[in-house]
């Protein structure tokens, strides 16, 4: 790994992580945010099979939201060695409700085309109505997703593709494209979970039947590379994805999801298997289930630097105004015996009730709005795994009282 790249991604990661812990300078809110991106589906069809129904598109959106928020049902399949590296991106997706002309829309646009396939030397033909495709809605305002036939000579040649943000340092300039081509393109047979056109079909389709091609391609759209860094056999371990919590991997994974694969075995370092669970691998969908924390930091960094014009909805998780900090004297938290975190109070003027939120270091909410009273001013940590947590104490007026990191240990 080049030193410059190492310094760069460290800076990106630290910026994203530290911004979850401290207020941004000159703003009133903490920066722990949830982004929601507006999506428009462009359906290009030459026959009825290609004109997939709304339910599949809405299901695809559901898959995006579940996988990006780590709400997918198969998180339990993340192997123990990687569980601490998996996290919630805090990025949501919703169908656009207003079109570029200001009119109401369902976020789904359909167009008949004379083209039997959009697989060609110029894959971007699908993005132009003059070539039988559909013009993008302003790519600085919408996440455009085109759904079309990407077959070649009757074979399912390509399942999807996307481009990274223009100028993104993880990619060479050959990978950058101008704004009209920004967005995601999907083969119609792999849209949604259990699409009948892919489930039980040829291996490449059956192993891609959980709607995660879209998850993978949106990862590219937000700047992520394949976890093997697009290296090849013989030199792949020296090629990097610029993400430090994805283990080095020589080549893409096979569909067999081999949990014992370790294609970059370094005898002098800690051993990690290939991360077949990662959405940015080519492993079968049934073993994919995670993004890593540094992948998350990189995607959120792309939204804050390279895709700033997207009109994302922003939800401030903490909803804590810095200027309204309401301090109580001699108040602190500490971990005590009996698996508790106790609020130590020496001020008789404390309110009769307070509320506690607890976050783990990935930003996930562990305990939500737990009520404390003067007779029971403590929180149980019995169900919390060992680690560092952020305890956020508020009064009944929702004013922040105290915010403190505490290390929870287990005997």
Regions flagged by a language model, labelled:
Residues 121-226:
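Active-site-proximal segment of zinc-dependent metalloprotease catalytic domains
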Residues 288-326:
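A recurrent domain-boundary module in secreted/ectodomain proteins
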Residues 358-366, 389:
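Short, glycine-anchored, charge-dense loop/turn motifs used at functional sites
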Residues 1-139, 148-149:
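Propeptide-to-catalytic entry region of secreted or membrane-anchored zinc metalloproteases
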Residues 192, 199-289:
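The catalytic-center signature of Zn2+-dependent metalloproteases
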Residues 343-345, 368-370, 386-411:
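C-terminal tail/sorting-segment detector
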Residues 375-379:
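Short strand-edge motifs at loop-to-beta-strand transitions and within beta-strands
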Residues 312-342, 346-349, 409-410:
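Residue-level detector of functionally pivotal "anchor" positions at catalytic/ligand-binding pockets or at interdomain
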């Amino acid at each position: 790994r080049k030193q410059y790249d190492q310094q760069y991604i460290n800076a990106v990661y630290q910026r994203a992580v530290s911004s979850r812990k401290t207020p941004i300078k000159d703003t009133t809110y903490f920066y722990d945010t949830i982004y929601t991106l507006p999506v428009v589906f462009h359906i290009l069809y030459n026959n009825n099979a290609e004109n997939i129904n709304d339910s599949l598109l809405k299901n695809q959106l559901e898959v995006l939201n579940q996988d990006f928020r780590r709400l997918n049902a198969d998180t339990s399949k993340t192997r123990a060695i990687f569980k601490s590296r998996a996290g919630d991106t805090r990025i949501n997706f919703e169908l656009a409700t207003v079109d570029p002309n200001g009119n109401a829309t369902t976020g789904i646009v359909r167009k008949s085309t004379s083209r039997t396939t959009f697989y060609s030397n110029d894959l971007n033909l699908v993005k132009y109505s003059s070539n039988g495709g559909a013009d993008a809605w302003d790519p600085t305002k919408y996440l455009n997703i085109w759904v079309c036939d990407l077959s070649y000579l009757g074979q399912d040649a390509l399942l999807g593709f996307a481009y990274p943000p223009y100028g993104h340092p993880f990619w060479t300039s050959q990978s950058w494209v101008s704004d009209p081509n920004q967005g995601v393109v999907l083969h119609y047979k792999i849209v949604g979970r259990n699409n009948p056109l892919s489930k039980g079909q040829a291996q490449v389709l059956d192993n891609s039947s959980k709607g995660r091609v879209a998850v993978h391609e949106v990862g590219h759209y937000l700047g992520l590379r394949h976890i093997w860094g697009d290296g090849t056999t013989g030199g792949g371990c020296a090629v990097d994805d610029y993400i430090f919590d994805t283990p080095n991997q020589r080549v893409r994974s096979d569909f067999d999801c081999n949990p014992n694969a370790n294609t970059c075995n370094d005898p002098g370092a800690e051993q990690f298997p290939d991360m077949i669970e990662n959405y940015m691998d080519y492993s079968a969908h049934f073993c994919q289930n995670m993004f890593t924390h540094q992948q998350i930091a990189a995607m959120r960094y792309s939204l804050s630097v390279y895709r700033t014009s997207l009109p994302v909805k922003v939800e401030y998780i903490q909803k804590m105004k810095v200027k309204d900090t309401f301090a109580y004297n001699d108040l602190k938290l500490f971990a005590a015996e009996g698996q508790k975190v106790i609020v130590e109070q020496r001020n008789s003027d404390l309110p009769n009730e307070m509320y506690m939120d607890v976050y783990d270091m990935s930003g996930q909410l562990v305990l939500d709005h737990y009520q404390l009273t003067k007779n029971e001013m403590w929180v149980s940590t019995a169900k919390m795994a060992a680690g560092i947590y952020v305890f956020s104490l508020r009064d009944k007026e929702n004013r922040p009282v105290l915010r403190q990191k505490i290390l929870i240990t287990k005997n």
